[in-house]
């Protein structure tokens, strides 16, 4: 009974919020807010505009470090495992890989935007 009541309340609240958001008018409508690009690029301009290669290298570096950090996020729950030494070894390996790759990027000047 509690599950059905919770489900009913959640569906009702969700439907109510969607209806309110749909029927209320948007107050601040201007071109900067309605544009899907908020990063300074002109969406109606040329699609063949060249980008700096440094931009892509920094973006890929960010994605790799972000992925490694996402792999470290479940570590607090992994401390409850039976084989604690394997978990600690894996965590230490990931952290050292992160530190070594950061040092490599730093020495190769991959983190500097201007040359």
UniProtKB/Swiss-Prot annotation:
Core subunit of respiratory chain NADH dehydrogenase (Complex I) which is composed of 45 different subunits. Interacts with TMEM186. Interacts with TMEM242. GO terms for biological process: mitochondrial electron transport, NADH to ubiquinone. It is found in: Mitochondrion inner membrane. Its EC number is 7.1.1.2. Belongs to the complex I subunit 3 family. Core subunit of the mitochondrial membrane respiratory chain NADH dehydrogenase (Complex I) which catalyzes electron transfer from NADH through the respiratory chain, using ubiquinone as an electron acceptor. Essential for the catalytic activity of complex I. It comes from Ailurus fulgens. It is a multi-pass membrane protein. This is NADH-ubiquinone oxidoreductase chain 3. Keywords: Electron transport, Membrane, Mitochondrion, Mitochondrion inner membrane, NAD, Respiratory chain, Translocase, Transmembrane, Transmembrane helix, Transport, Ubiquinone. Its main location: mitochondrion. The gene is MT-ND3. InterPro entries: NADH_UbQ/plastoQ_OxRdtase_su3, NDAH_ubi_oxred_su3_sf. It catalyses: a ubiquinone + NADH + 5 H(+)(in) = a ubiquinol + NAD(+) + 4 H(+)(out). GO terms for cellular component: mitochondrial inner membrane; NADH dehydrogenase complex. GO terms for molecular function: NADH dehydrogenase (ubiquinone) activity. It comes from the Eukaryota. The chain crosses the membrane at residues 3-23, 55-75, 84-104.
């Amino acid at each position: 009974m509690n599950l059905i009541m919770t489900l009913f309340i959640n569906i009702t609240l969700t439907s109510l919020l969607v209806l309110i958001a749909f029927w209320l008018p948007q107050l601040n409508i201007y071109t900067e807010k309605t544009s899907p690009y908020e990063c300074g690029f002109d969406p109606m301009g040329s699609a063949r505009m060249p980008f700096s290669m440094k931009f892509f290298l920094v973006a890929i570096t960010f994605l790799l470090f972000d992925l490694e950090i996402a792999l470290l996020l479940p570590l607090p729950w992994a401390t409850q495992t039976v084989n604690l030494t394997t978990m600690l070894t894996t965590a230490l390996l990931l952290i050292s890989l992160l530190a070594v790759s950061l040092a490599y990027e730093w020495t190769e000047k991959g983190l500097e935007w201007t040359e």
